[in-house]
C-alpha cells in the first residue's frame, strides 16, 4: 500500500514503575497511531516484570501490528534494541522510547526521502528536546545544517562526529541490514553507545541524512532514565569517566563486535 512504510519500530521496556509511565506510554503509542504514513510493525522487547506484562497484555494498541518478546536476561537498553532489530520483519527499523513521541508526518517524510535518495541508508529527524514539564529545552541533530560543523549540509559524516557528539538515534530510521553488516549497539558502553554506533556507521561510509523537519519529541533527562542516572542518580559518572567513554568510542568504532570495556578510576 502507498501509505505504509516498510519499517519496524523497536520499543525496549525495562519496567512500568517510572512516574507517569501509563501516560507517557499512551502518548507514545498514539503518536504511532496518528502517523500519516503507517508503519509495518511495532516490536516490543520487554522484561517479565509482572505489572509490565499485565499492562502490555491489557493495553489497546488499536490497528498497530504488534510483536511482543519477553527479555529474560538482565535488562539492558542496547541488548534489547539489538534483539528487537534481529526479530524485525521489515527492511527499515527505528528505535523508540516509551516517553517519546513521533511527529505525525515523520514516517511520511521518510518514505518520500527513501524514494528520492535511494543511496541513503539512514535518516535522522530533527529532535525537539523538552523537560518533564513539556517545556522546550533545545534541538538535537540540527548540527548537520551548521556550516561550521560540516561541509556537506544535511549529512552526518565521520569528521563532524569527531568535532561534535550530540546526536540522537532514537527516532532515526535506518536499514536493518546495517546491523547485520556492521554490528548493533554495544551494551558494554556507558554513556556513549549511541555516539560509538554513529562513528562506526560513518567510518564504514554509511550515508546518513537529516530530514529538515521536526520528526521526534524527546524528554531530556527524565528522572530515572539512563542518562539521568549517569548525571543525578545512583550511577553518577565523574568527569574523568565521561571523558573515558568518549575516548573509548573514538577507539572502538573500528570493531563491529561488542568488546569488553572497563573504566578504572584514577587514584
PLM region spans:
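Acidic donor-binding loop at a coil-to-helix junction in glycosyltransferase catalytic cores
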Residues: 190-197
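Nucleotide-sugar-dependent glycosyltransferase catalytic core
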Residues: 135-141, 189-190, 203-207, 211-243
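Short aromatic/hydrophobic "clamp" motif used to bind/position activated sugar donors
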Residues: 93
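Conserved donor NDP-sugar-binding/catalytic core segment of glycosyltransferases
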Residues: 105-139
